Amino acid sequence: MVAKYCPIKYRYITDEAVEHGILNDYEIIIHLLDLDKSLTYKQKTKKGYFPSSELKNYNYWTEKLMNAGSFKEEQILRVMRMKSMMGYPSKERYALRLFNKITDKVILFANTQEQADRMCTHSYHSSNKASEDNLKLFKDGDIDKLSCVLQLNEGVNIPNLKQGIIMHAYGNERKSAQRLGRLLRLNPTEKAIVHILCYDNTVDTTWVQNALEQYDDSKIKWIKANE
């Protein structure tokens, strides 16, 4: 009677599953990057582009956000600032070096399809006709690097996937869980490493903290990245 009309909902969190030996252990490394101050960033305007820096662009959108006249305007500006930050080249440069340095089987979660194609010879996204072939090569172990956009289908299992790079955390615990879930399918005796790139002294740190709210702090390490 109780089970039928008053079902009990129980949330089984990731760290409990790790502790019980159902999922493999993990380590999350947050790489803190400084916004680039050099005038190499092209800021788009109605008249075209003009040279700016990542720091100036971030401050520009943050100031506009602080002076928003309505809740709707604030929402729009938050999205516009986030999209600008996702396009900053310094994070892409750092991610590419990290990606190429890793010798384990590794997946990179890019922000856009264009970025995924730039970051890796083999990419997986809806506009790439070779996506399924690339995924099969990756699953079968014929290649050890793959870039993708958002998350792969929940049913896709990739054997021996030991490391992952997340370009942007979104501040969304569910999206982060889906991405981290790709790396929690090893043998329970093994450990996966998740790299999250984050701009220091920006709203990006808040997004990362919110995304990882349900994860064990002792498994999370913040390091200063060297550009």
PLM ranges: what are they?
Residues 182-213:
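Conserved segment of the helicase C-terminal RecA-like domain
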Residues 16-19, 32-37, 114, 152-153, ...:
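Conserved nucleotide-binding/hydrolysis micro-motifs of P-loop NTPases
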